[in-house]
Amino acid sequence: MENDLAIETCTLSQDKITLYGKQSVLDQISSIDVSLPVSSITSDRTLKLPITLPSGITTSDISEVSISVTVGKQSKKTFKDVPIKFVNLGDREASSDISTVDVTVYGGEEMLQKIDKEDIIVTADLKGLSENKKTSLALKVSGENRLVDYKLDTSEISVTVTKK
């Protein structure tokens, strides 16, 4: 998508799908992703996109979905003091030089209005870290809304892992 443009709204023609397959596979599915080719969208339009079924699903009641997209000017919104969550900590404790970071979200104004600080997840993966050693770790940021871009103002933190 062009730098000054962003998706304002995105509406599916169908919000439900019936899947057929083994019950054990069906029990593991809560949603179906449809890939939207954002880079090719430069104006308001409706696209028909195929639905790719997960492995183990034999068929579904629909094979494609129409997505209506409206485009607007890109805006940004900064969220202050988003907490950092440590993952793969196990039975250890972690201390770091900072506990929160600022995150700037880029997208359409309407999309940005729907995002709260609680929707943003910043993580530091502690897997494989040695204990009692200060280590620089890259932070990762994500959010539920995948039609916006999340950017960290701080990309690394220093962490020390110790036994509880």
Where on the chain are the PLM-derived regions?
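Interfacial loop/beta elements and low-complexity acidic/Ser/Thr-rich segments
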Residues: 1-164
